[in-house]
Amino acid sequence: HMKLAVSATMIALAILAGCAPKAAAPGDAPAAAPDTAQPATDALQQAIGSDLRSPAEKARDVWRHPKETLDFFGVKPDQTVIEIWPGGGWYTNILAPWLASGGGKLVLAVFDPAAAPDDERRARTETLNEEFKANYADPKFGTLEYTVFSSVSGPLVAPGSADAILTFRNIHNWMAGGYEQKFFNDAFAALKPGGVLGVVEHRLPSTGTQDPSASSGYVHEDYVKALAANAGFEFDGESEINANPDDTADHPYGVWTLPPVSRQPGEDEIPPDGWDPAKYQAIGESDRMTLKFIKPAE
């Protein structure tokens, strides 16, 4: 329950800080030899099934497909991986023990106190970051490293030092702040040549109109691809593993109408026409794009 509480607080803080006004293919690399591939897969399954994850987190695997997603991105347990804005740590709880077991390294880019608009919110961001780090003090998570990402942050890590950079359901937050291109530029600089950028994001159908600040939480796939191309990335493929054809991406409270947030009308609010919470529970979690980009080899 602690993790869930921290997650909710971080989202609330992000709203206050103006970070998130509304919230929370085949590669060219040769296949690993069977004797090395199998233990890596087993170790990932072990991390996914581990008691470091809460039952509530595991219940979302059916929507978030962590094994298939990480396999698609081609992440290996001996790599240096950066997770950008880990939020409540849903993916961190899988990545940290898995990379620890394989001799890899996980770097977490958390909220940036320097981007907070005032001293009070800066202090609150610092406190949240300390609470987040305290959650990962258990040696089972390995030795984690920390950096920050924001509209004003410097390099994520030493240039050209990361094998993979991952971010899950965050692009809309950076669009809201107007610094989405900076994310792709910073990721490009941090990756080794041949390194992978893996993005999962709520998908707005191409027929829908893209709000530049993504106030619904949904984003056009073509826009994400353009941001990556602008930064120098090659598009390497996409997967439909996190798709949900039942999601029309057109809901009264945007993506937050759906689980896991399942936003409800406020006490003094007149519910939207035909409001039926059961309908949104039945849809499930959002339709998501899963995109893989590569930093070209030099």
Regions inferred by a protein language model and the residue ranges of each:
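Conserved class I S-adenosyl-L-methionine
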Residues: 77-87
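Conserved beta-strand signature within the Rossmann-like core of class I S-adenosyl-L-methionine
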Residues: 106-109, 194-202
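A short, conserved alpha-helix within the catalytic core of class I
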Residues: 149-152, 173-186
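A short acidic, Gly/Pro-enriched loop at the edge of an enzyme's catalytic core
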Residues: 154-165
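C-terminal lobe and adjacent flexible extensions of AdoMet/dcAdoMet transferase-like proteins
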Residues: 273-298
